[in-house]
């Protein structure tokens, strides 16, 4: 896609189609900068086109340990993934509160919480469609470099790269010190993600270009957990803007296939 807006709308269109075809879909939802445009487009579709989420179940992809929905704090200071999803998406659509699932970031027993989250996904029938980004170090969810590609929901320590990114992108701007920011995260595992029936992976900007190339064209390795996308056997859609796609060696071929696919209404790989 030419730009972030086009990327976001393309992803939202796929999610909307999923929800229309299966109103009780189970969605796995990522947070961060990249998917904000997707959620805003889905909100627009809900308000202007009547897209309903009333029977949808939603599972957030991860949550920072020690963070949780705190409505008392201003949104800029509450950096929990639960608050993000509420402010950017859930409060604007008709999804039922009981169908929204978050990791409990305040848990005193992370292992138990992760097991319960895994079980809740299973009891819901599994994830129908999982929305993902990719970290600058290639992490999927918060499965940092070295995480097992067969991992289930688990607690992970954040790497220096992720901590630096989080500090510069979020915490420094609101006066939170490095010592005060979260250093651990509860996340769906790579194995959990790979069991979703459909995947959408998004990436935007030149800062993601090299890691996108490594994940899609390089070896499958636990050092770049997003490279596990190459193992995925279901329906996967990777949506990149021009900047994020700029280092792919086969970009001309991909663009050619995209044009042919649109012309003949085919899905090419």
Residue ranges and their predicted role:
Residues 39-40, 44, 48-69, 126-129, ...:
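Active-site histidine-anchored catalytic micro-motif
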